[in-house]
Design a protein with these regions (language model features):
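Gly/Pro/Ser/Thr-rich low-complexity, intrinsically disordered segments predominantly at protein N-termini
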Residues: 1-186
């Protein structure tokens, strides 16, 4: 479940890394949000999306690197914001080190879970936009909806799991969500 720990103090990334092994959390503006383990449907969608993105990048000989959670993103290059997007695509490889990504990924995909709904649609939308993420997709299997925000062009696409969704950071890449829906029996 994604909820802040009640504390008047603010936390830092040091507190995140001090959590017991296996506990996942994100840090937004100094507040810790614990994360529930993802369900099978969530993981199936994440796997299908990652595989499609990774295959595309490799087929084009691209220099961008896709990552799936848990992967550390130090969003504002400070110690008050740490997220683990379901999928991150980083094209500036200078942002990468052994701990993760220092700064905004180019493309972020979040797959909505019941416990992450408010975070994905509101807090993360704002944080990703202001941090410099170029493109943000919110994939919501419960609502059969994909919102694709292209922050560079100020476009928002609203799709279903029967549509193909074009990636804004690539000219010739789209993901067929109907194929993913078939895997999920949607």
């Amino acid at each position: 479940m994604s909820f802040p720990l009640l504390n008047l103090d603010t936390y830092t990334t040091e507190d995140i890394f001090a959590l017991p092994e296996g506990r996942r959390a994100e840090l937004i503006d100094g507040q810790i949000y614990m994360m529930a383990p993802p369900n099978r449907r969530h993981q199936t969608i994440a796997r299908e999306l990652f595989t499609a993105i990774d295959s595309y990048i490799k087929s084009k000989g691209g220099s961008c690197e896709p990552f799936f959670a848990p992967f550390a993103v130090f969003l504002n290059q400070d110690n008050k914001n740490y997220v683990e997007p379901d999928i991150s695509v980083i094209c500036d490889l200078g942002k990468l080190d052994d701990k993760g990504c220092n700064g905004a990924p180019d493309w972020v995909i979040e797959i909505v879970s019941p416990s992450s709904r408010r975070m994905d649609y509101h807090a993360k939308l704002f944080k990703y936009r202001t941090a410099g993420v170029r493109e943000y997709w919110i994939v919501d299997p419960e609502k059969n909806r994909i919102l694709a925000y292209n922050f560079e062009t100020e476009d928002i696409g609203d799709y279903t799991f029967q549509d193909s969704v074009k990636a804004g950071i690539y000219d010739d890449f789209q993901i067929d969500f109907s194929a993913i829906a078939k895997r999920l029996d949607m």
